[in-house]
Swiss-Prot record:
GO terms for biological process: cysteine metabolic process. Keywords: Cytoplasm, Lyase, Pyridoxal phosphate, Transferase. The active site is at C364. Belongs to the class-V pyridoxal-phosphate-dependent aminotransferase family. Csd subfamily. This is Cysteine desulfurase. Its EC number is 2.8.1.7, 4.4.1.16. It comes from Yersinia pseudotuberculosis serotype O:1b (strain IP 31758). The gene is sufS. Cysteine desulfurases mobilize the sulfur from L-cysteine to yield L-alanine, an essential step in sulfur metabolism for biosynthesis of a variety of sulfur-containing biomolecules. Component of the suf operon, which is activated and required under specific conditions such as oxidative stress and iron limitation. Acts as a potent selenocysteine lyase in vitro, that mobilizes selenium from L-selenocysteine. Selenocysteine lyase activity is however unsure in vivo. The modification N6-(pyridoxal phosphate)lysine is found at K226. It comes from the Bacteria. It catalyses: (sulfur carrier)-H + L-cysteine = (sulfur carrier)-SH + L-alanine; L-selenocysteine + AH2 = hydrogenselenide + L-alanine + A + H(+). Pathway: Cofactor biosynthesis; iron-sulfur cluster biosynthesis. Disulfide bonds: none annotated. Its cofactor is pyridoxal 5'-phosphate.
Amino acid sequence: MSFPIERVRADFPLLSRQVNGQPLVYLDSAASAQKPQAVIDKELHFYRDGYAAVHRGIHSLSAEATQQMEAVRTQVADFIHAASAEEIIFVRGTTEAINLVANSYGRHFLVTGDSIIITEMEHHANIVPWQMLAQDLGVEIRVWPLTATGELEITDLAALIDDTTRLLAVTQISNVLGTVNPIKDIVAQAKAAGLVVLVDGAQAVMHQPVDVQALGCDFYVFSGHKLYGPSGIGILYGKSALLQQMPPWEGGGAMIKTVSLTQGTTFADAPWRFEAGSPNTAGIMGLGAAIDYVTELGLLQIQQYEQSLMHYALAQLSQIKSLTLYGPTERAGVIAFNLGLHHAYDVGSFLDQYGIAIRTGHHCAMPLMAFYQVPSMCRASLALYNTREDVDRLVAGLQRIEKLLG
């Protein structure tokens, strides 16, 4: 059965607008994806017809909202094949999820002299929290280097591990290069050495099925807004045995069992001990609708459609003589490039005048820019609503810029 691209595009209202007098070509979904009408309607319905504060409310609206929120927790667990809904923590996004692990697991279990491993392709969100932790605790950060093709050589991992190594933090798919890391094999090697493994799935969950139990990782993190859901909501998956040992990171309402001015505070069980304060309930509802949307389409079908589109895009872009492509041939989601010696910002500005939205800059991956010895790159990202016509518009725009600027 062919992928229903016309129906899919009709589901996303913003795709029908014009930018600078041109039909919009949106190629920036890796930064944040557009929202289907079903997600917009779900949030609107909650605010209009069912809004109430969750937890501890005796009245019907509160009970209904709490039940719906917890149903989404179960839905997320099913979506990534977690063993239990109690392994799912609602956070603001990938960045907060990684910071939670660094500040709760890291500060509780790591000591001076320990070491952790990150890779050269990580987003700043999977670098800076570990650097802050290392500075405070005296922990060493070891960097898994890239190959010339922008990939990780799994045989290089063993050389980074010794009896001080406690944790590996690695992205599943690079937000710049689209490199798809062999996470299952990486996790197996790390676990054999006794490491805890955090996987950044922010660029993966929208492009392929994810099974955290099959991957074997201890933590898995992603954001809703890249999965066609609302902004301000994300997920931290953690194995139950680890979560129950971890102390809270933030204090406040909803994460306690008891509070006494003389006896101190006792904390709720995981996952609720990590969800201080009023949650983004509408965002949680919208995330549930987004998961429903991609599940109905089928992640395997989405993956197959996007891979076909990626192969077409790479073939077309490779015909532009002055264009430099970065990263491996086999990739998912994103295409990083530069056009001659022109600054990425200039290229992006010209494309915007043609109604084409891409991302330009260092993409929160300055170490990766240093690896390629460039200050910035252009990045076009492909999503389930993009088409060959979108790719053709991008190629034509780049050829026009090439002709104008030389």
